Curated annotation (Swiss-Prot):
Pfam families: Aldo_ket_red. GO terms for biological process: aldehyde metabolic process. Disulfide bonds: none annotated. This is Putative aryl-alcohol dehydrogenase AAD15.
Amino acid sequence: MARHFGMALAPWDVMGGGRFQSKKAMEERRKNGECIRSFVGASEQTDAEIKISEALAKVAEEHGTESVTAIAIAYVRSKAKNVFPSVEGGKIEDLKENIKALSIDLTPDNIKYLENVVPFDIGFPNTFIVLNSLTQKYGTNNV
């Protein structure tokens, strides 16, 4: 619809709420006694977040950077003509990584690779609505 009508997109949480981090960054955090600064979820990455972070790191290396967040932003920006992602960051280094994304053009192979790392999650409220209606219809053991 956005493409058809020439609408802009402003995706939110494109960097996974700070949960997309390279293995090196996570090891450094642990060494310093830090965890992921997140309002929602555990202080460690989930298996899916680890897989996504590793894939972002692999693509980042192909583009000559260590910034998984720059790749995440570049990925979202590649999906439509007018994309203005809402980005976060609490340090100057975060801002520099966000800006770096503007100079990264992902290849079709990069995009395909990133899209196949984990199954697509349609997210809330869709998962809640569908799961709730299925459990009501079939019971929790059958969903």
